[in-house]
């Protein structure tokens, strides 16, 4: 293998373009991400990137290959309007031989070609030392910390009961009925969140098509008087969770409409989802929260969640 392999892409032009990877290419990158995630304990690609790869969305990507021709490293750059988000992943068996450096250099060229040098964010999932070194080598600085918090099995077994405000009821999501109402509440609840608040109907449909989606696990808080949606807790339990370790559930998203603040819905919804996942037999529960969202961090800490890992987002100063 070459010490500094030249990344290949599905686009033969010298000028960088946003393209759609072939299905077999996308599948290979997703398999690579699964291998790396299993080895590192941290998923190297965000859900949005995985969804785009799976559905054939448009993005820039580059890859390195081993002597057998198999993809052993990949960089994925997802355009978001005038900005972009970059993620890199290298097979655990192909590290420390220049794969990450080659991919980062190719991605930097792509960012320049796409005129997004000042608006591209780069994720270092798990803040692995190699990823942090690459970010610094390219003159990037951390601008955001995403904490991964975990609720232990003991804490999960000792959860307090759910207390709902008067006039509020809980129910499961109904496909074909609740999509627009959910999108409206999600957009309002996450108006300042760069990923969650921008979800579209297509994004929602893609997630509903995932094998882990469970309509009853997307809990909705509604006003009894008129059925108006006030908030939600979207839980996530992978079908094969627990196959190679603890069975992990996830607080995928908790959102409360701004005009329903003050009713204690954030705590009630979080607890309701945790109880449901406990009934499903999960061993522990994870969640992701921005470090500067002090109110949410305080809520989760009060329920027994502890810091487990962290992701860092880098950008040019």
Curated annotation (Swiss-Prot):
Nucleus listed as a keyword: no
Binding annotation for acetyl-CoA 2: 254-256, 261-267
One example of a Gene Ontology biological process annotation: mycothiol biosynthetic process
Lineage summary: Bacteria, Bacillati, Actinomycetota, Actinomycetes, Micrococcales
PROSITE patterns: GNAT
Family: Belongs to the acetyltransferase family. MshD subfamily.
Domain N-acetyltransferase: 14-166, 168-317
Protein name in the entry: Mycothiol acetyltransferase
Quaternary assembly: Monomer.
């Amino acid at each position: 293998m070459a010490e500094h392999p030249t990344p290949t892409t599905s686009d033969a032009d010298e000028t960088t373009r946003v393209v759609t990877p072939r299905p077999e290419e996308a599948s290979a990158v997703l398999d690579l991400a699964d291998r790396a995630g299993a080895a590192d304990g941290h998923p190297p690609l965000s859900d949005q990137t995985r969804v785009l790869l799976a559905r054939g969305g448009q993005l820039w990507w580059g890859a390195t290959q081993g002597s057998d021709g198999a993809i052993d490293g990949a960089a994925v750059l997802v355009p978001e309007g005038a900005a972009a988000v970059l993620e890199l992943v290298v097979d655990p068996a192909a590290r420390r031989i220049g794969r990450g450096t080659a991919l980062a250099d190719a991605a930097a060229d792509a960012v320049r070609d796409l005129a997004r040098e000042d608006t591209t964010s780069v994720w270092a999932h798990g803040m692995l030392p190699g990823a942090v070194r690459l970010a610094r080598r390219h003159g990037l600085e951390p601008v955001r910390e995403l904490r991964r918090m975990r609720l232990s099995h003991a804490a999960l077994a000792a959860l307090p009961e759910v207390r709902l405000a008067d006039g509020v009821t809980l129910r499961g999501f109904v496909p074909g009925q609740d999509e627009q109402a959910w999108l409206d509440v999600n957009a309002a609840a996450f108006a300042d969140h760069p990923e969650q608040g921008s979800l579209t109907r297509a994004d929602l449909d893609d997630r509903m098509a995932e094998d882990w989606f469970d309509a009853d696990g997307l809990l909705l808080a509604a006003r009894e008087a008129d059925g108006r949606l006030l908030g939600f807790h979207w839980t996530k339990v992978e079908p094969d969770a627990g196959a190679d370790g603890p069975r992990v559930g996830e607080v995928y998203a908790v959102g409360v409409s701004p005009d329903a603040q003050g009713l204690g819905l954030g705590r009630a919804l979080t607890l309701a989802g945790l109880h449901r996942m406990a009934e499903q037999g999960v061993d522990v529960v994870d969640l992701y929260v921005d470090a500067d969202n002090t109110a949410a961090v305080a809520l989760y800490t009060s329920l027994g969640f502890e810091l487990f890992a962290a992701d860092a987002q880098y950008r040019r100063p």
